[in-house]
Amino acid sequence: MTLSSSKIALEVVRFSFRLGEKQILQEISFQVAEGEYLSIIGPNGAGKTTLLKCLIGIYTVGQGGIRWFGRPLEEYRRRQLARRISYVPQADGRLPPFTVEEFVLLGRYPYLSPFTTIRPWDRQAAQEAMEATQVADLADRLLETLSGGERQKVFLAAALAQGADVLLLDEPTTFLDYHHQAEIRALLRRLNAAGRTILAVTHDVNPAALDSQRILALREGRIAFCGPPEHLMQPEVLRNIYSAELLLMPHPSTGQPIIVPTALETNENQERLK
């Protein structure tokens, strides 16, 4: 997929964002094609989560512009935007006193007015979303009784029930063990293959390189890299993003370069060992 041959879902032009006295994002410009899978990586504090919150309108847009499907973000009403875009935050905040099914049904709110009761097809959409994320057997459990990984899957189920064209995901496999990480990654690949546009923040570069068509890397609030995974997975490029020396080896199945985690050496540590 190339941007020149595809319709543009998202266009960000010279966007900057300040939170209080701190400049979080600076001169951010990029595009995402409809049906593309873009991973967003970078060190802690680089501005990844803030970027997602700006893209969905949680934070007021500062300088520059954000356009979804050719329309400025600020022109969308909340329900209109929610029918096109689902945002899945990290499931580590305060939880409402809802059961899993009740929470997943919240994903249907863009299609309900204050005077509309939940309809059979809303429940069907919620059931299908719970089955896709393998939380259907938890339907009657309260959110507060779930593990971190289970909560993360429930948050994703609510986004799927929303039925939006775009998924904005903040660390979607956080708290999951390797088995469930693989299941969620496979689900996201299937959704992307079916036409969903996905923007996913992650700290794990290896899955990002294997799953996405392009990767955007932030460093200190600026774009340090934006391109295909094969251009990212080079020592000098990764060094510029993470200030670390990373050993790359071929993936045993695909042959693509992957990072060997135990080989990470920060520049600071190297200086200390001299």
Provide a role label for each language-model segment.
Residues I241-K274:
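ABC ATPase nucleotide-binding domains
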Residues L105, P120-L138:
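Conserved ABC ATPase "signature" region
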Residues L167-E171:
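Catalytic Walker B motif of ABC-type/P-loop ATPase nucleotide-binding domains
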Residues I41-P43:
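The feature captures the beta-strand-to-loop junction immediately N-terminal to the Walker
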Residues I56:
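Helix-to-loop junction immediately C-terminal to a conserved catalytic motif
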Residues L142-L146:
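Conserved ABC ATPase signature
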Residues G64-P72, L81:
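Conserved ABC transporter NBD signature motif
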